């Protein structure tokens, strides 16, 4: 026994002092000077079943592990963080978690990258109301505060606009990034079906003297239909919240904001899968997370990413 213990002690000591091995799974950009951002589609499929929640932990752990390798500057999430915002009665045909359990699970997954890389969110219809965006109530600002991420996000946060409950929230917020080889970038997040006030705030921000020369990325949960619906811009959502005057669906966002502001160069949305279209000569395409958009420029790309409804698409980012 003493010999065995001595052998194990020696082995552990050798392991402790041995140089780190080169990992076979390290991903690096082809250009060492390149920068990246991670786009996460709607994660509700990960959190509505407890058995799927560890998959989303793997997603955020992979991000944390590759921040330096890929020079990741931010993580952008298109919302629908939970399946239902505020419900305790379980419909076991579609979930086995209460709303509180889902909010705590998705918050826990993102806590893995708190203080490591900023994560920005545009909440979706599932993040509001009782079950189906019946009203403007959301638990998002209770779980996703600026303080939880600390300086890693506060140094980028340059403006915000109150949500529909009148609360300070990162639902409507603007973040400034400086990447090597790029103009300065302004990323604007939005609440689901943003209010007229939030839309006007974003417009004023984009054309202001301070940000008029920035490349603007606007992220909103809902903007386009899927390819089965001809990739059209959503004319009007059918949720009670979106029926209220002053809340804007896709066509209203195009008319009031995207078509009016030239430095909005990229719009990111979730909600539907496989969207792609050309609008007034502006490129609007990306079929799946792994799609390659050919013969297109960066100008006015509209990406629509949606993870598999049942299990979150196995952890792809």
For every predicted segment, state its role:
Residues 1-22:
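Bacterial Sec-dependent N-terminal signal peptides
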Residues 32, 92-99, 197-200, 209-265:
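Active-site-proximal segments of metal-dependent phosphoesterases and phosphodiesterases across multiple
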Residues 34, 71-72, 116, 183-185, ...:
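A general structural motif
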Residues 39-41, 73-80, 115-124, 190, ...:
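Active-site neighborhood of phospho(di)ester-bond hydrolases with catalytic His/Asp-centered motifs
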Residues 46-48, 83-86, 123-132, 170-173, ...:
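Active-site environment of divalent metal-dependent phosphoester hydrolases
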Residues 244-317:
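Conserved beta-sheet core of the metallophosphoesterase superfamily
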């Amino acid at each position: 026994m003493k010999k065995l213990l001595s052998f194990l002690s020696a082995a552990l000591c050798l392991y402790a002092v041995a140089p780190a091995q080169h990992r076979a799974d390290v991903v690096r950009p082809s250009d060492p000077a390149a920068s990246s951002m991670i786009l996460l589609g709607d994660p509700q499929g990960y959190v509505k079943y407890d058995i799927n929640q560890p998959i989303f932990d793997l997603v955020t752990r992979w991000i944390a592990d590759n921040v330096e390798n890929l020079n990741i500057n931010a993580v952008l999430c298109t919302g629908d963080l939970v399946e239902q915002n505020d419900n305790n009665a379980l419909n076991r045909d579609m979930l086995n978690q209460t709303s509180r359990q889902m909010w705590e699970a998705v918050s826990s997954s993102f806590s893995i990258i708190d203080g490591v890389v900023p994560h920005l969110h545009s909440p979706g219809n599932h993040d509001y109301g009782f079950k189906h965006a019946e009203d403007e109530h959301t638990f998002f600002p209770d779980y996703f505060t600026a303080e939880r991420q600390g300086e890693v996000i506060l140094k980028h946060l340059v403006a915000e606009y109150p949500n529909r409950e009148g609360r300070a929230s990162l639902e409507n917020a603007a973040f400034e990034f400086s990447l090597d080889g790029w103009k300065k970038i302004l990323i604007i997040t939005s609440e689901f079906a943003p209010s007229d006030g939030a839309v006007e705030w974003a417009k004023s921000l984009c054309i202001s003297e301070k940000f008029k020369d920035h490349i603007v990325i606007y992220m909103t949960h809902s903007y386009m239909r899927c390819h089965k619906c001809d990739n059209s811009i959503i004319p009007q959502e059918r949720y009670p919240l979106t029926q209220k005057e002053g809340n804007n669906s896709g066509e209203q966002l195009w008319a009031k904001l995207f078509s009016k502001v030239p430095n909005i160069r990229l719009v990111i949305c979730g909600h539907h899968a496989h969207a792609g279209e050309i609008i007034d000569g502006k490129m609007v395409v990306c079929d799946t997370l792994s799609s390659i958009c050919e013969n297109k420029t960066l100008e006015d790309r509209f990406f629509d990413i949606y993870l598999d409804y049942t299990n979150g698409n196995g952890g792809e980012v």
